[in-house]
């Protein structure tokens, strides 16, 4: 089978190679999935560079999120062959992957593979962060990197609940689509004063919560635009720069900054919560109450082109790997 592998840590363009490997055999409790589509997310890039929350076991196959059909079952597993599944785990960028059967999520029949391969990480992170922020109708939440797939899911979920969203982008061309999606205000971080823009948009109320993917000076500006007792949830570091914290601001506004990692949040849920949240999110995606944008699909042999496109400026949708190409 073909797989995208790296044998050392570094930039994807320097360390990724498409290789031929034996088709894996499912162990006890596992299923083998014939992968149809896979997502490319920032966590994939951080993992390849050794900057993610888990370390690669070299040689390592890349990719964390995908969809496909059950191709074989290990001992103790009874799952019909051909069953569509949504799954996460390391080593997804391959034509076949073995995963624990209990972690596979059945794919709704009406859900396309384009949506299914991105149906877990970003939608559930958006749901989880809104849940942790405990926002109510009328509250304000601010998003950095508002044009990202994650932020678009937050905008949709929040607006459905009457929560007001402000976002930052790096070009005016990105504004209108996000406003059409449900955001109340979009700020060009390069040309506008963030504090003044937030004050105007919120009529001086400022924001109760912020979801930050960038870090650095931008996150510091967002903290300054928060109301007393506000909470910032940090889930990324696109700038690769730490947040320069203003101790006085934290003290006198009683601000809270905390990290958010989907794996930790999912593990914290009760069985009852999981049985409610997972179907709710998948139903919204299937009915397109949550819309997932796709910009382009590439074959596994085009992985370097796909990553270059994913990391390039001005992108408006997800970049996928299509294993049928």
Language-model regions: role of each:
Residues 194-204:
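Short amphipathic alpha-helix with an adjacent loop that forms part of the alpha/beta core around
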Residues 217-289, 322-325:
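Glycine-rich phosphate-binding loop and adjacent beta-alpha segment
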Residues 11-13, 20-67:
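N-terminal glycine-rich beta->alpha transition that marks the start or flank
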